[in-house]
Amino acid sequence: MDLLKVLSQMILFLLFLYLSPLGGHSYPLGSPSQSPEQFKMQKLLELIREKSEEMAQRQLLKDQGLTKEHPKRVLRSQGSTLRVQQRPQNSKVTHISSCFGHKIDRIGSVSRLGCNALKLL
């Protein structure tokens, strides 16, 4: 073979190896070591877990501090939410106007669509 031809083929082969994406970044399957991307993801997951635990502890301390400082305020707010939850059950529903027949008005009152308006007393 011609020396010039062999030299040009070797240069092309080395250039191909240099530019190939599998150059030095290949990781065998099932290797005990982690890839850099997996390592970064593990670090991020650990950081997120730590932050969420810190936030949960802060919220718990805040809630405990709130109940120690203002127990009456908390009880009032709980009582008002109870009243709000009980109101629709105890109130009477009356029809203000009727645009369509009785069956359509009943469907409109359930879906709250149409011209049938409900008034809570």
Curated annotation (Swiss-Prot):
<dbReference type="GO" id="GO:0014898">
    <property type="term" value="P:cardiac muscle hypertrophy in response to stress"/>
</dbReference>
<feature type="disulfide bond">
    <location>
        <begin position="99"/>
        <end position="115"/>
    </location>
</feature>
<feature type="site" description="Cleavage; by FURIN">
    <location>
        <begin position="76"/>
        <end position="77"/>
    </location>
</feature>
<dbReference type="GO" id="GO:0001935">
    <property type="term" value="P:endothelial cell proliferation"/>
</dbReference>
<dbReference type="InterPro" id="IPR000663">
    <property type="entry name" value="Natr_peptide"/>
</dbReference>
<dbReference type="GO" id="GO:0005576">
    <property type="term" value="C:extracellular region"/>
</dbReference>
<keyword id="KW-0372">Hormone</keyword>
<comment type="similarity">
    <text>Belongs to the natriuretic peptide family.</text>
</comment>
<keyword id="KW-1015">Disulfide bond</keyword>
<dbReference type="Pfam" id="PF00212">
    <property type="entry name" value="ANP"/>
</dbReference>
<dbReference type="GO" id="GO:0070482">
    <property type="term" value="P:response to oxygen levels"/>
</dbReference>
<dbReference type="InterPro" id="IPR050787">
    <property type="entry name" value="Natriuretic_peptide"/>
</dbReference>
<dbReference type="GO" id="GO:0031667">
    <property type="term" value="P:response to nutrient levels"/>
</dbReference>
<dbReference type="GO" id="GO:0032991">
    <property type="term" value="C:protein-containing complex"/>
</dbReference>
<dbReference type="GO" id="GO:0006182">
    <property type="term" value="P:cGMP biosynthetic process"/>
</dbReference>
<dbReference type="InterPro" id="IPR002408">
    <property type="entry name" value="Natriuretic_peptide_brain"/>
</dbReference>
<feature type="signal peptide">
    <location>
        <begin position="1"/>
        <end position="26"/>
    </location>
</feature>
<feature type="site" description="Cleavage; by FAP">
    <location>
        <begin position="91"/>
        <end position="92"/>
    </location>
</feature>
<dbReference type="GO" id="GO:0048872">
    <property type="term" value="P:homeostasis of number of cells"/>
</dbReference>
<dbReference type="GO" id="GO:0000165">
    <property type="term" value="P:MAPK cascade"/>
</dbReference>
<dbReference type="GO" id="GO:0005179">
    <property type="term" value="F:hormone activity"/>
</dbReference>
<dbReference type="GO" id="GO:0060976">
    <property type="term" value="P:coronary vasculature development"/>
</dbReference>
<feature type="compositionally biased region" description="Polar residues">
    <location>
        <begin position="77"/>
        <end position="89"/>
    </location>
</feature>
<keyword id="KW-0964">Secreted</keyword>
<dbReference type="InterPro" id="IPR030480">
    <property type="entry name" value="Natr_peptide_CS"/>
</dbReference>
<dbReference type="GO" id="GO:0007168">
    <property type="term" value="P:receptor guanylyl cyclase signaling pathway"/>
</dbReference>
<dbReference type="GO" id="GO:0097746">
    <property type="term" value="P:blood vessel diameter maintenance"/>
</dbReference>
<keyword id="KW-0732">Signal</keyword>
<feature type="region of interest" description="Disordered">
    <location>
        <begin position="61"/>
        <end position="89"/>
    </location>
</feature>
<protein>
    <recommendedName>
        <fullName>Natriuretic peptides B</fullName>
    </recommendedName>
</protein>
<keyword id="KW-0838">Vasoactive</keyword>
